[in-house]
Amino acid sequence: EEQLYDQQYIDGFTENWDAMKAHLKDFTPEKMAEFCGIDADSLRAVARDFADAKSARMFWGMGVSQHIHGTDNSRCLISLALMCGQVGRPGTGLHPLRGQNNVQGASDAGLIPMFLPDYQSVTDEGVRSAFNEIWQSDNILDQKGLTVTEIMDAVHEGDISAMYILGENPAMSDPDVGHARDALAKLDHLVVQDIFLTETANYADVILPASAWAEKTGTVTNTNRQVQMGRPAIAPPGQAKEDWWITVELAKRLGLNWAYEGPREVFAEMKRSMKSLENITWELSLIHISEPTRRAI
């Protein structure tokens, strides 16, 4: 109603603005005040501050994203930043803060169902061919996998009867906890690999004791893309093992010829397929370094 949007930015860098504008027409501050518990005048004041600022930046965390409609929440914030032109300039941007210490590193390494490492599409034949060669495989599927919530739906639908969960606690963190717990209870077999007897581990048929951060060697990458080395301060207790060791031993028992002797060899393989790590070496581990490096750019 006050035309606070940045028309020049919208025209140059966005699509479907007319449809978005028409969609938002009925969402007045007065109407939204009933839903969010903030009066209309305050909503207008915040909108003016954000839109009129020379530079404005958004940060959000799990309170926004870990909902059954978390993706839509994030898309709304992205659209808001785009329509106000608060993207692509110093002091602007969007920063979805992760919930744990290495979500960025795990995502970089391919723990997203539609991507292989370094956000390379699993549907790209050239990408799959390269990874088939690196991993000595010939059967990487050309279809994206399932998200955590989709996995739980698939269990209820009878498409999944067994799961192997590493370092995750969906019985507590899933947006619909009851739905997730019912799914875990329906499984024929559940393996959980973790450092604690979590709510999810209570549903497990087999528990593999993993090691904590201070008990193992490896790297983590934060949201600022800093790759940092961790080294063990103490040995893992009891029968606990490092995650890479458990994975390799399971692979060997399944008949795979995996010969990794430690995280260093795993990191070397990652560098072969991830240009973001191109100029980062194990020898640089005395310092932290950010990716993508100058050479990778």
Q: Can you name each region flagged by the protein language model?
A:
Residues 287-297:
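Single conserved hydrophobic/aromatic residue that forms the stacking wall/gate
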Residues 109-110, 126, 295:
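Disordered, low-complexity tails and leader-like regions
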Residues 1-102, 122-286:
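Cofactor-pocket helix-loop regions in the catalytic cores of large enzyme subunits
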Residues 102, 109-114, 118:
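Surface-exposed loop and adjacent secondary-structure segments within mature catalytic domains
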